[in-house]
């Protein structure tokens, strides 16, 4: 039997204006406390996704249109460790399922797909920031809270105040997550390419 709601993995460069509009409508419905955040674009701390995992419900009728019912975006961040090693990591953003389709396992399927794709692209780690009530959900999926501080920085090298203040990580290979405090940057801010250079040499 065919999956009634198949998952799609879309690179940002194939998401046209129509799909982008539907995604933003979905995000606005799922995050009503941020009504203006997705009005014009899908950007998380000044970065667009590298790819997005979607679930769409096919609309019936000649004039119908597909409805986005599930979404996970993956933005590429650079994490810098105490020892000044830098890694590009897959940052999970906008995990959301339309209200009528929650508690069906779609969120878990989308996150798994997003991590599989990050692994396929060569990333060593995935990171996310979530609110405290969601920590048990992610822990059940193998995510871990960091033992040390994680600070995200903006383009002016000022720390960003995070509304979702529980940093978590997943190891995508057998390489352990770096120990000690971690800084999170826009890749270009610290001289890393968004696409490629999954692991850099030590920065002197």
Where would I find each of the regions flagged by the language model?
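A conserved beta-strand-loop-helix scaffold within acyl/acetyltransferase catalytic domains
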Residues: 9-96
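Conserved GNAT acetyl-CoA-binding A-motif
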Residues: 116-130
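Conserved acetyl-CoA-binding loop-helix of GNAT-fold acetyltransferases
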Residues: 97, 103-116
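Residue-level recognition of the GNAT/N-acetyltransferase active site
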Residues: 98, 131
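Terminal substrate-recognition subdomain of acyl/acetyltransferases
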Residues: 2-3, 10-15, 30, 119, ...
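Short loop segments at secondary-structure junctions
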Residues: 57-61, 100-101, 171-176
